Amino acid sequence: AQNVIAPNTLSNSIRMLGSQSPLIQAYG
């Protein structure tokens, strides 16, 4: 279960940060 939750958390964090940092959107 943790293996599935980890990537989801990263994706969510990257998307939230992407709103403020356009550079991060490239990674998302």
From Swiss-Prot:
Organism, scientific name: Bacillus cereus
Chain segments annotated as coiled-coil in the UniProt record: none
Superkingdom as given in the UniProt entry: Bacteria
UniProtKB keywords: Enterotoxin, Toxin, Virulence
Protein name: Enterotoxin
Note: This strain was isolated from a food poisoning outbreak in Norway in 1995.
Record-level Gene Ontology MF annotations: toxin activity
Function: One of 3 components required for cytotoxicity (tested in African green monkey Vero cells); the complex is not hemolytic.
Subunit comment: One of 3 components (of 35, 45 and 105 kDa) of the enterotoxin.
